[in-house]
A protein has these predicted regions:
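Short helix-coil-helix linker/hinge
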Residues: 1-7
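Hydrophobic positions on the alpha-helical face of helix-turn-helix-like DNA-binding modules
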Residues: 10, 23-25, 34
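Helix-turn-helix DNA-binding motif, specifically the short coil turn and the N-cap/start of the second
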Residues: 19, 28-33
Length: 60
């Protein structure tokens, strides 16, 4: 699953060092929504990583 534009934006802002509170303020969002979007994005990244590792293992 691909990351949404919002998920990418939130991860980018976190990488720049902004807190959930600052991101929520900057994007005019509620803080629980920022946390949920970040959590969903990280889950998608972990699933994609696991898929790649599985595909790599099948090639061996």
């Amino acid at each position: 699953m691909a990351l949404t534009e919002l998920e990418r934006k939130i991860l980018r802002l976190h990488a720049e060092g902004l807190s959930d509170y600052r991101i929520a303020h900057k994007l005019n969002m509620e803080m629980p929504n920022v946390k949920r979007s970040r959590k969903n994005a990280l889950k998608k990244i972990e699933l994609a990583k696991a898929d790649l590792e599985f595909a790599d293992a099948l090639k061996r």
